[in-house]
Curated annotation (Swiss-Prot):
InterPro entries: DNA-binding_RecF, DNA-binding_RecF_CS, P-loop_NTPase, RecF/RecN/SMC_N, RecF_2. PANTHER family: DNA REPLICATION AND REPAIR PROTEIN RECF. This is DNA replication and repair protein RecF. The gene is recF. Keywords: ATP-binding, Cytoplasm, DNA damage, DNA repair, DNA replication, DNA-binding, Nucleotide-binding, SOS response.
């Protein structure tokens, strides 16, 4: 799959933008704060109906206007798809795929797939478990609508369970009904996460080996608060029952997929605690490029690769690995200079110069 064309209107610092993209490498060059990342952000938004930079949609609208528009034409093996999104300042949005209105965000997932790599992705390794869970959830949602459905249901039931825990009229029988529903969704979520981690380990072994010239081994380990061998549902239900007194005191559910994490080990060393910044960056790179392989395995097409100002952050080995993968994947790169890229561009590649919301091919 690849993006054939993009149109933006009143989106951040773009009043009107229309671009035809190459199905190969597309490079957006310019100084900082000129609008390069805004292009990548708009593509990401069309995949997930959310920005990777802000939780407030109104930030995406040009400050002089009340609404912004994004339109993408995506070429796929079987059928081209057009995605149109209108973003309103009151927080509402209207999404259409091939002129058909999308009523639920989950219906948008999988229309096309993206993998983004940016300097902020170091947070996946360095910061809280919630960021690592978000990484897993976002990757799984775009390849599995069933995962998205179970995740939404789980969070809904979890919130309702927490209300019951805090209620003065606490009813244990009602709580048990919610627990059984929670366990069903959790079972699917954890199994899918474990399978995804297994796939990252499979592909990541080869990717990390190539980046480090065989000097390091990397392992990803899912860390669940529920210890189980075969029957996750039984183990989770028992944990909920055993933790009931504490959960009542705190007014929250203290265990479940919403509290899980995963650890990254390089040569058996916890990268978050003891890894160098270079090792942490390599771990993120391994995760992202493993995701490329996983999406290709499941959908039979490579996703679009978005590289947001990351080349300047990479040493020569990491940079060489990234650039060597671009031949089969539509890649959209932002950078301040083209020197590192010249050997990897061909006749299909396009270079765009960006200056204050204006783009010249």
């Amino acid at each position: 799959m690849y993006i054939k064309a993009i149109m933006l209107a009143n989106y951040r610092n773009y009043n009107n933008l229309e671009l035809n993209l190459s199905e190969g490498v597309n490079v957006f060059i310019g100084d900082n704060a000129q609008g390069k990342t805004n292009v990548l952000e708009s593509i990401y938004y069309c995949a997930f109906a959310k920005s990777h930079r802000t939780s407030r949609d109104k930030d995406l609208i040009n400050w002089k206007e009340n609404e912004a528009y994004i339109s993408l034409l995506v070429g796929k093996k079987r059928l081209d798809k057009r995605i149109d999104i209108k973003i309103l300042r009151d927080g509402k949005k209207a999404i259409k795929v091939n002129s058909i209105k999308i009523n639920k965000i989950g219906e948008l997932f999988g229309t096309f797939n993206v993998v983004m790599f940016s300097p902020e992705d170091l947070k996946i390794i360095k910061e809280s478990p919630g960021i690592r869970r978000k990484f897993l959830d976002m990757e799984l949602c775009q390849i599995s609508k069933k995962y998205y459905f179970n995740l939404v249901q789980y969070n809904k039931i979890l919130n309702e369970r927490n209300v019951i825990l805090r209620s003065r009229d606490f009813n244990k029988d009602i709580l048990e009904v919610y627990d059984l529903q929670l366990v069903e969704c959790a079972d699917y979520i954890v199994k899918e996460r474990l399978e995804y981690i297994d796939k990252i380990n499979y592909y990541g072994k080869f990717i990390h080996n190539e980046i480090t010239s065989g000097k390091e081994d990397i392992v990803f380990k899912y860390d669940s608060g529920i210890k189980f061998k075969d029957n996750f549902k039984y183990a989770f239900l028992e944990k909920l029952r055993n933790n009931l007194l504490r959960d009542r005191e705190q007014g929250i559910t203290s265990v479940g997929p919403h509290r899980d994490d995963f650890n990254v080990l390089i040569n058996n060393i916890d990268v978050k605690k003891f890894g160098s910044q270079g090792q942490q960056r390599t771990a993120v790179l391994t995760m992202k490029f493993s995701s490329l392989k996983i999406i290709k395995e499941i959908t039979k097409e490579y996703p679009i690769l978005l590289l947001d100002d990351v080349l300047s952050e990479l040493d020569i080995n990491r940079k060489r690995y990234v650039l060597s993968t671009l031949s089969d994947i539509q890649t959209i790169i932002t950078c301040t200079g083209i020197n590192d890229l010249e050997d990897y561009l061909d006749d299909k590649s396009k270079v765009f110069n960006v200056c204050n919301g204006e783009i010249v091919n």
